Amino acid sequence: WARGLVAAWDGQLTKQSTAGAIYVRWESAVDDRALDPTTPQAERRALIEAGLQAAITRLTRDLGPDRSQWRHGRVHLSALPNMMVSTFDLPAVERPGGFGAVNANGANFRRIIDLSDLRNSVASNAPGQSAQPGSPFYGNLAENLGNGEYFPLLFVREDVEAGAAHRLTLQPR
């Protein structure tokens, strides 16, 4: 069943992809000799099959026997630990993509700057803008990270002022 699922797979590492979860675990389990063209065909087949069995064993161990729970997002997570106290850790976020994919990711902060029009610039900063637990901006962007969503990155003064939630004024003494 796993071979057929991966053979019919579209190659996209979406969070929901069962075939993607199997492939990623297979890729980490398969012996490098299986990909070496100088390895005899019969040995390569055996190594590939052993890698697939190892992937299934690992998915069963990590995610349980219910194959409907075998989703790529569950094996490709971004941890969101608090820098100071683990009590304030946020739940890990399921993410699409992965190493070797077009949507390779790892960083929780991204910026896309449009130098032709700064108003088109966007960013992602998970888990949020604030490192202070209890702030409404502490974990508010974690879901965006998992969905590959961005927020407008404000550069133009009137946009910054219109988008500000608070204003802090420092006055010298």
Question: PLM features: residue spans?
Answer:
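C-terminal/peripheral segments of proteins
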Residues: 4, 8-173
